[in-house]
Amino acid sequence: MTTPLTASSPPAAPSMPSTPFAPTTPVAPADTSTPTGTPPQSAPAAPAPAPAPAPAPALTAPGFPETQVRARARLGTAAVFPDPTTYGSRLFGPENAPGPADALDRIRIVPPVFMPERLEKLIDLAREPEFDDVDLTTRIGGFTARLPLYLSAFGSTRAGSGDLAVHASRQAARLGIPMVIGENMVPVHGYRRTATKGGDTTRSALLARVEAYLEAAPDGVGGIVVQQSTEDADCEVWNLLYSDPAFRPLLDTGRLAFELKTGQGAKPGLGGMTVVGRAEAEELARRFTVREVFGADAPHQLRCAVPGTFTEEILSQQLRFMRNNFPKARTWVKFHPGRDIAHAARTAWAAGADAVTVDGAEGGTGWAPGVFLDQAGLPLAEALRRIGTPAGCLLATGRVWEGGRALRALALGARAVGLGRAALVAVDEDPAHGLRRLADALALELRLLISALGKYTPAALAPDDLWSPPPPFTPDPDPDPASDTVHGPFPAPAPGHPR
């Protein structure tokens, strides 16, 4: 009998059985009759106990493609394609992404017909190029990375400073990508190892992540970036790290960077926020502002960090201070998606920053007011448009989880993209391999897409590899009939397009 074809769109993440790709086998109904020669039972046997339900995930991420990320954390590169058991019985076509697409996701990737760079690669290889010939090795803020990815900053929030962050650190090291450690880790959790009542010692949250990364990091790739905000500066976090012998291997190999945090995409203009119990709030009140926003009888309080104050001159002086006082560490700076992001980025590069990170309004966080999550900050696509051709290393974060979104950011000028919520959800799904599988799937998509554009490195990508849908039509109040120029939303690449 011929299996009928169905015409359907591929799921955003393949719908997989619990055992990947195992075909479903019909189960015959149980025979309840008494076999010949068997005496009847006086009572039916007790049913076998039901299997214990799988533990519920520790993390949820509303508004984020959590289901698709978890599928990639389980299946790796297999999740890039539809379920192979449907091959031959289903016809596939495009499907809209789940949930509302932002401006970056609405951009189409547009391979050309004529590909001179593919011809150059063919001559170089003496054969037809394939997608495996794409080299994803990237220089990120002074580090060498195997992929144009890095692990975004997890700070002192509960989700970002526990065991999941340690698992993510270890897997990022094995992937050969840099890791950023977020703000307020030392003011909240301390720095040195602390003794327990039994005489054992426990590592601080920051050192636990550093040691997990160093234990798994290959030689010559990756690196650790440590953020500092106002409260961190009061604790002299960078001085502690720079003088700690534990960080000597990173300094000696040029794999340590310090990142000045000026803001974040999820709450631009505000400092970090966490929810703490009343006992912890009393301890933290010496360093942070604590507010009773949840009610006088609530067991929790809001801990707030100050955002810091920056002008063009203050930022320039801060970056020069970092370069002069910590000459062996790379200098990074992170901006929220402010309306003057282009001016801020140019100022940072002029002051010698090795990397400038822009965190789009789609970026995640451990805690923020809803009005900021929904209404504040520039979308990542607009922030990249305003920056235009970067004058140095530009890094982008904000809802990155798959290769298409990553490629759009790279084509708009970013050198690499950060994985934040996607990384935490992946290690929540599989603490040992989830992030690696997620990165493997993303890397495969990047190789496929970059080669389809007739290019073979991420640095070769440019805005003309993209097409943005036109805005709703509005009549031109002063049309120029002599002009037939089509104005797109993104600037044309400068000659050479420095990346």
Could you tell me what each predicted segment is?
Residues 1-7, 54-146, 160, 170, ...:
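Conserved, well-structured core domains of diverse proteins
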Residues 5-57, 477-487:
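Intrinsically disordered, low-complexity proline-rich tandem-repeat tracts
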Residues 58-83, 230-237, 241-257, 261-284, ...:
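Anaerobic metallocofactor- and corrinoid-dependent redox/one-carbon enzyme cores
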Residues 149-155, 180-182:
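Short glycine-rich or small-residue beta-strand-to-loop segments that form or flank ligand, phosphate
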Residues 151, 172, 356, 409, ...:
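Conserved, mostly hydrophobic/aromatic
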Residues 169-170, 174-321, 325-348:
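Active-site-facing alpha/beta catalytic cores
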Residues 298-444, 473:
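Glycine-rich phosphate/ribose-binding loops and adjacent secondary-structure elements
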Residues 434-499:
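Extended, intrinsically disordered, low-complexity segments
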